[in-house]
């Protein structure tokens, strides 16, 4: 793939360092727009989300060349308003906005927010009822999704999203019709919602098909599934019209009795049981639209950059309905993560036309031949990551995504970790467990091997060992270093004295050498360069062990830390006599 690949969109969350909720808000927005590492096989929006804050009296500039479009979300509280360092920074952002390089969305978290810069127009502000993102989380999501949708789709000022409500008028309790009217009235009673939704009543299926085709770029569909919805011809026509045109659609379930038959083409879309709160429905609808629009642009760019022949893209998981109008030359379908399960693929593969259904991760795995190879991951957070706008949410997500992609290729994971709460060992164990369950593999199948050095492995309880076994994780306890007395071999202690520090350092070195004996390649990113417990920074030592064994090393230097230092050494040719390393700067 071309090295200048750009994502369709990236988002930067800007907050003052004294904003006590700033980091937490960034992580919530990251999980909202990108992914949550604790749920690696759920469908995230996959939009890159970074942050910027005033560290050491300076703010790192936003990289407008990272993506085709860039959004800056300003969290304007009293701290940002009072801190003069933001004055010049916001001026620079406004210049970039005037040049079309990015779009600013400011969140009003202070009564003085409108005065932070006279050129920052009031209509650019997301104004919340209580001026508190945590309290007004539902409202914030709606405003944020709407603003991002408009910018991504290049809507004109005042242009509305066309919302179609498909419902049955023949329920005995009139629940389908009354629910549709309730949604329409709710949207029209809220001036902000009415400003961006053009709510349409569908008179009949034929008219809907014409309407949807004439405004497909800005159309959304809400299906109210009541008792008689599947029985009504026009309802079925409306549902099929939405599917054929890939209109972002959701299903709102209001069943109040027995439905004699469920229309088969009401599946493969988000579904919600109506609980009387329309905000939940609107959030799901806008998220679904943003997901499809972003994935469509991303996959189209991927097909072009990778020069994929005879490939068509779908912004949703494929189903047989999607294959009806596929051109004869198309042999492969590229669709968003996560991959479909085997049972669905078995049905799709009987279509007799399309020979391959792949996600981006599977696309890459097909290009690599690392089945059953043991790939070691060297990763830890670095203080430098903060100045680069990379928080814990992204670091955790990165480690899980690398591991997930490796598992998809058929590789096995190897890591030298400990038992810290929130550490990478726990993350990788959870991933191994979820992947095994998803693949329906034999419980004895091992996906991840974790090496424990002495005396760390003395902290392993039977409960820990049982959990590792359940998670399909192999535990390797490495050799105890020389000089440890018999009475200490079964004990755990912290490296609090020079003699204990010496034993810890020796033990970690033994663990790293033994681990390297049993791997095929290593991926390196982050890494402490101070306050480490070994003879040197752990990632440095692991890289040296890999070089000595002539194993390939893949350095991701864009996250700072020891891996970045290693990249600099390589670039200065200090290691030119060693086996070449692959350097990846992200």
Question: What spans do the regions from the language model cover?
Answer:
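Conserved beta-strand-loop-alpha-helix hinge of the TIR/SEFIR fold
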Residues: 18, 62-113, 170-171, 213-259, ...
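A short acidic (Asp/Glu
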Residues: 22-27, 84-87, 116-118, 175-178, ...
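Conserved BB-loop
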Residues: 28-64, 81-85, 182-213, 228-233, ...
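Acidic/glycine-enriched connector segments
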Residues: 31-35, 60, 64, 70-71, ...
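Conserved small-residue-rich
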Residues: 161-224, 305-340, 373-411
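Extended, compositionally biased accessory segments flanking or bridging domains
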Residues: 1-53, 200-201, 295-308, 357, ...
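C-terminal interaction surface of TIR/SEFIR-family domains
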Residues: 1-35, 58, 81, 108-186, ...
